[in-house]
Amino acid sequence: MRLYDDELKIYYEIKEAQGDTYIVISDADKKLNGIDIPEEIEGRPVRHIAKKAFLGCKGLRHVSIPGTVRSVGEWAFAFCDNLTRVEMQRGRIELGKGVFKNDLNLREMDVYDEGTEEPDRIMVSHLMAAAPVIMDAEYLLDTLHCGEDEWLGKWDTKLSHILSLKDNDGYHLYVLCGEEDFHFDYEEYLEYNREKKSSLCMLRLVNDIALKEEDKEPLRDYLRDHTSGCESEAAIRMLLKRHGDDRDYYRMMLDIGAINDGNLEAVLNMMGDRHAQMKAYLIEECGKKKADFFDDLLL
């Protein structure tokens, strides 16, 4: 029998197997804007989130999944357009196929435990969120080993593979088979892939946990080759689209020379009347760099 929790705004079922009585969350109010799933409902542990339970909850922004949950079904949180943050306790959770499909605004997937340093945990949460959304790499949704050296190596290997692909890779399949979520002509398809690569390069350089110096340079090169003034300005477009007011990303782009005195005006024009604080920051920092340059000449 399906029951409804008026406070949580979810539907659930009470199941029993091998002497264990537990809760399965089966559906949710589509107007839900956030939920901290409890460890127990009616004194019974929440063990499973069913297939498509939160599918299409357009207003859902954050989800917290307790450590009692053992599995999350296919497409459970798919097409949640505004989902930005997911919290899960570190442990072995079975995540179904397409569990976060098309959640394009997902930015953090925080897998927490008591032993992880806060800065590392934050960086890993950003890398985890990119796995299903940008990288199409659901095998990286490893809630037990994420953040470990081997997992980070797999993440970086996937990034290297993505960067090695030609921008038109897969276009013939896209044309033949179609893709319900995207509609591109050839040039738009090329730019889409450049934007994806730029976004991942920025993400990894800012969240540089265990990233070796020699592995940073190809990422920097890619961003410098796709900044304002280049044939493709994908890096600046994604900077503004995904990180419009995040100073850490602007600082990184300044540090690597992807934003500089030569293209500052063009970048500011692309920003239009948005991101006023970041515009002021860029103007100030480029001014400092110019002053430092002339000071060095006088020495």
Regions found by a protein language model. Give the residues of each.
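Short amphipathic alpha-helical interaction segments
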Residues: S71, D245-D248
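Short amphipathic alpha-helical segments and helix-helix/interface helices
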Residues: G96-F100, Y250, K279
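Structural signature of tandem-repeat unit edges
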Residues: R2-I23, D29-H48, K58-S71, D81-E94, ...
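Ankyrin-repeat intra-repeat helix-capping/turn positions
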Residues: G244-D245, R274
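Charge-dense, extended regions
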Residues: M252, G257-A258, A266-L299
